Amino acid sequence: MGFTDETVRFNLNDGDKNEISNTLTNVYRSLAEKGYNPINQIVGYVLSGDPAYVPRYNDARNQIRKYERDEIVEELVRYYLKGNGTDL
């Protein structure tokens, strides 16, 4: 599949946004409980897609794999922008 010069729309429904946020929080806690640096591990997963960055502990690996990585990135960007005063 090739690239286009046309702008493409990407939409994520509101229900998924809340679920992704909750999942990231749960995964973060599971990683911290196991002694990992949660931010580094989540970034490793998002960039590579390799689920080995997230442990099976507390079902964290299965939870995060329910979502496409682009959906996770969208939620992270939205959260960051809202936290910095951007009106979305």
UniProtKB/Swiss-Prot annotation:
Family the entry assigns: Belongs to the UPF0297 family.
One Pfam family matching this protein: IreB
NCBIfam families: PRK05473.1
Organism: Streptococcus thermophilus (strain ATCC BAA-491 / LMD-9)
Protein name according to UniProt: UPF0297 protein STER_1937
InterPro entries found in the cross-reference section: IreB
